[in-house]
């Protein structure tokens, strides 16, 4: 799983995963 930016937790990653 790759996220644009992971800071502290997966909070910024959640909308990214939903988007695809």
From Swiss-Prot:
The keyword Disulfide bond does not apply. The keyword Ubl conjugation does not apply. Stable between pH 4 and 10. Thermostable. Retains antifungal activity between 4 degrees Celsius and 60 degrees Celsius. Activity reduced after 30 minutes at 80 degrees Celsius. Keywords: Antimicrobial, Fungicide, Lipid-binding, Transport. Disulfide bonds: none annotated. GO terms for biological process: defense response to fungus; killing of cells of another organism. GO terms for molecular function: lipid binding. Plant non-specific lipid-transfer proteins transfer phospholipids as well as galactolipids across membranes. May play a role in wax or cutin deposition in the cell walls of expanding epidermal cells and certain secretory tissues. Binds 1-pyrenedodecanoic fatty acid. Has antifungal activity against P.digitatum (IC(50)=7.5 uM), A.alternata (IC(50)=1.5 uM), R.stolonifer (IC(50)=8.44 uM) and M.grisea (IC(50)=2.19 uM). Has no antibacterial activity. Homodimer. Belongs to the plant LTP family. This is Non-specific lipid-transfer protein PHP.
């Amino acid at each position: 799983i790759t996220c644009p930016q992971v800071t502290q937790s997966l909070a910024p990653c959640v909308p990214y995963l939903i988007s695809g």
